[in-house]
Amino acid sequence: MLRSHAAGSLRPADAGQNVTLAGWVARRRDHGGVIFIDLRDASGVSQVVFREGAVLEAAHRLRAEFCVAVEGVVEVRPEGNENPEIPTGGIEVNATSLTVLGESAPLPFQLDDEAGEEARLKYRYLDLRREGPGKALRLRSKVNAAAREVLARHDFVEIETPTMTRSTPEGARDFLVPARLQPGSFYALPQSPQLFKQLLMVAGMERYYQIARCYRDEDFRADRQPEFTQLDMEMSFVDADDVIAVSEEILKALWALIGHDLPTPLPRITYAEAMRRFGTDKPDLRFGLELVECKEFFADTTFRVFQAPYVGAVVMPGGASQPRRTLDGWQEWAKQRGAKGLAYVLVGDDGTLGGPVAKNLTDAERDGLAAHVGANPGDCIFFAAGPPKSSRALLGAARIEIAKRLDMIDPDAWAFTWVVDWPLFEMAEDATAAGDVAVGSGAWTAVHHAFTAPQPQSEATFDTDPAGALADAYDIVCNGNEIGGGSIRIHRRDVQERVFAMMGIEHDEAQEKFGFLLDAFTFGAPPHGGIAFGWDRITALLARMDSIREVIAFPKSGGGADPLTGAPAPITPQQRRESGIDAKPKKDGE
């Protein structure tokens, strides 16, 4: 070893020891004939002092981020010179030898200053030397280890599934890899290990997991990555409660890493209730401000805007004091989300109603509105009217925005809930409008994916009543973030083929794309279910990071670009010819 001790491990009890440290020069300070450096390694920082002779002369050439090895004696710092902000603040190392292991060029940014994201990603190897980013990756390693420990106790088997497979419709576009030995044909990088883990259940593995790399060629969305990581699990001979129980044990172990005792079992809320009360399927439960249904209250209204399939409201406490410019800003805020605007009523200090909507209400409506929605004098009532899904989504977004503006969200709180009783299908046009890919050519598509089992009471009727069919599915939400989703799977060929048919995937197409799975179901497939956790998002939450990029070693920037390596990049004409990208695949029999 080139060092005897870690820089962050030294304490006053080590005084008098000869040590060898190795790391980077975090700071250098010249105090008139004495040079101090903060020497940083993965464990922390120690102060090193160069006082005289050749070692002092050598220290004059040190600059930030030089990689060095230092020999010296641990000394207790003089009284008054201690640094209580760091664990090693009571000692310093009096250097007797200095070796420069690697010089550093002038830095593109100072590591202890803020830097732009593009520069940080281009020089990610420098960015990771900083305490925050480096600490996040080390936490990620602990997260992996904690999950593996729980799963080992439950006899799970860690199995790697292929990362080059065939393209199958799973809800997003595939990344494609040309097959050189079969010109015109392509592998696909997996969007998830879904089909392989189900095949492993058919194979009798019973309990599988994998920390899996997944790939989705999606249009750019904020804080999405084209390649990401899941903790993927599957279990045979289980129901939803069994999968949820193991999942909660994992979550409890993960949050224990940051000193939080997660109480289990976690609460559950149905999808319908989440949409009704919070306007979203991933509700943030750290604060109140629930939506209020107003359709019946305005059943006889003459106000045409409120003669809609859905009318709802959310109250902004103290919002009546907002100036007109701020209220107009809410309209722009709503239009940015595809709405025409955000109707509002102001409740005066004396209880009278004001604003442009109030004059369109009857006396009875004005008299009873505040009580119906739970508004007090000085509050603002925001409304949405129209199709239920989009109107609730607008109010749900307004609820979050209100909470942010009023500082109602406790940043230290953790609020978990399972969302259960999901619809099995949604209209394909609704999925497309929401930015998702509607799998299949039918009018209906799967809300989760095509392999989700219907609940028992919906199994016989989902093809005649798709709107009312419920899925045996469950998502886990933390602080308004979906951090995992799973379901009991279909394990019978006839049920799977009926689901495909509902989605417009007819027999021949299903056999071509999923025949291997359908065939497997004919060989005694066990009931099974599982879940996949968004590992990047979970780690970001634990690290208190706003973006998943902060917990990924080498993330992509917006649009999937990699400033570090310059990927994606053009290929050479020779590579294009050899890969067979432009070749037409041979037809059967040719």
From Swiss-Prot:
CDD domains: AspRS_core, EcAspRS_like_N. Keywords: Aminoacyl-tRNA synthetase, ATP-binding, Cytoplasm, Ligase, Nucleotide-binding, Protein biosynthesis. Disulfide bonds: none annotated. Residues 575-590 have a biased composition (Basic and acidic residues). InterPro entries: Aa-tRNA-synt_II (IPR004364), aa-tRNA-synth_II (IPR006195), aa-tRNA-synth_II/BPL/LPL (IPR045864), Asp-tRNA-ligase_1 (IPR004524), Asp-tRNA-ligase_1_N (IPR047089), Asp/Asn-tRNA-synth_IIb (IPR002312), AspRS_core (IPR047090), GAD-like_sf (IPR004115). Its EC number is 6.1.1.23. Belongs to the class-II aminoacyl-tRNA synthetase family. Type 1 subfamily. Aspartyl-tRNA synthetase with relaxed tRNA specificity since it is able to aspartylate not only its cognate tRNA(Asp) but also tRNA(Asn). Reaction proceeds in two steps: L-aspartate is first activated by ATP to form Asp-AMP and then transferred to the acceptor end of tRNA(Asp/Asn). Homodimer. This is Aspartate--tRNA(Asp/Asn) ligase. The lineage of its organism: Bacteria, Bacillati, Actinomycetota, Actinomycetes, Mycobacteriales. The gene is aspS.
